[in-house]
Amino acid sequence: MSRLFQKEDDIVALATPFFSSALCVIRSSGVSAIEKFSKMFSDPSKLLEASGHTIHYGYILDNETKEKLDEVVVCLYRAPKSFTGQDSIEVMAHGSLIGIRRIIDFFLKVGFRMAEPGEFTLRSFLAGKLDLTKAEAINELISAKTRQVHALAVNKLSGSLFDKIDLIKKDILNFLSAISVYLDYETDDNEVVIPVDIILKSKSELERLIDSYDTARKLENGVTLVLAGSVNVGKSSLFNLLLKEDRAIVSSYAGTTRDYIQASFEFDGILFNVFDTAGLRETSDFVEQLGIVRSNSLIKEASLIFYVVDLSGKLTDDDLKFIDAYKEDSRVLFVLNKVDLEQNNQTVEFFNSNNVVSLNTVKISTKTLFGINSLYDRIRSLIAVDYMKTSDYDVVISSTRQAELLKRAYALIIELLSKIEQNISYDMLAFDVYEVVNVLGEITGEVTSDDVLDNMFKNFCLGK
């Protein structure tokens, strides 16, 4: 049965991760949540008589043997002034794994059932405590991996997206009102002037929201950064430097990295998925050959490529092949490493020559850290267009569901403008206007189906 029809059940779930910790939070909600929980609390009358938004100290007890299970602090909320709009109990207990299991078992014994993923937030939505844009923002907030994504989710949780959609809806309904006035007072002597500017404004707002989706997805997925180059040029040293930890083995032996190593780091609030790849060279080692094939595949799919060159050594045939193939590729930054060593004159002259002077290059030393700030500046400039333009938008869309609905609304607006241009009967335009409003209502949840809600909330984590 759909969770929409089980909202009177008393539910319980662990709201914090299930591992040993100082504290954990177990949350519950339901019509009889306080009454049922009181049966396993050391002072039941105190809870039954307590007002909402109060905190109580006591013990979780086995209601049959009166054995103390844990010393706890209980937050009590009474309907309708709670997250779910129902009576709710949140228990702060010690984060012992066996203790958590035993406490939840006793919740189940007194009549609670385990909550399904997202069920607390679903109940909050059904109680009118939040709209769907805020519900989705909660999920985005929990799963945020970087400061920028986190900030965007907080912005939507504060109601920015709902307000934007609501404003567009009001503009479109104002357009409908204007048509109605013209129809009421239209005479043969008066030419009806449709306020197309209102629809054009809505079209522009929808375009911006749809455009923001690509930026949001890039921020969530992060930058795929591939470190490529010949063997022993310092790729693994650069990998460790970017991560600020020793993840890759650094050795003077060629071919130490035989397959790629992947890790993530955050830079300026943006997620980077960085790959340290096998050095490009001719080799008879089968495993290393596979690593090089994978390296080439990663290079083709990368958002950014740092091709590392050893300025103290000669350029290899693989270096020259790569430079020729990727010299006009805007994703590539040639990182000229080992400037702290005596430099190879031929290599230096090559990068100073007219043929390659236009290459995007930066000189560094992973050993002395020379040029590292310049490298960071180059990273900023390389990702600025695609990953650092969130300030261009007052609201950013990151939900696929929202993006698809916005595209539907935009298509309907385009169709509406076409009908206006064709002088379609004004009373017929009202049907199209209402269709746009309904689609926008699906974004906020004012118009939606049970199946949509079930599918959306099942992707939430337990306890939320």
Curated annotation (Swiss-Prot):
(6S)-5-formyl-5,6,7,8-tetrahydrofolate binds at residues 27, 90, 129, 464. Binds 1 potassium ion per subunit. Its main location: cytoplasm. InterPro entries: G_TrmE (IPR031168), GTP-bd (IPR006073), GTP-bd_TrmE_N (IPR018948), GTPase_MnmE (IPR004520), MnmE_dom2 (IPR027368), MnmE_helical (IPR025867), P-loop_NTPase (IPR027417), Small_GTP-bd (IPR005225). PROSITE patterns: G_TRME. Gene3D superfamilies: P-loop containing nucleotide triphosphate hydrolases (3.40.50.300), Probable tRNA modification gtpase trme, domain 1 (3.30.1360.120), tRNA modification GTPase MnmE domain 2 (1.20.120.430). Transmembrane segments: none annotated. The keyword GTP-binding applies. Keywords: Cytoplasm, GTP-binding, Hydrolase, Magnesium, Metal-binding, Nucleotide-binding, Potassium, tRNA processing. Mg(2+) binds at residues 236, 257. Its EC number is 3.6.-.-. It is found in: Cytoplasm. One of its GO terms (molecular function) is GTP binding. SUPFAM superfamilies: P-loop containing nucleoside triphosphate hydrolases (SSF52540), TrmE connector domain (SSF116878). Residues 222-384 form the TrmE-type G domain. Its cofactor is K(+). Homodimer. Heterotetramer of two MnmE and two MnmG subunits. Exhibits a very high intrinsic GTPase hydrolysis rate. Involved in the addition of a carboxymethylaminomethyl (cmnm) group at the wobble position (U34) of certain tRNAs, forming tRNA-cmnm(5)s(2)U34. This is tRNA modification GTPase MnmE.
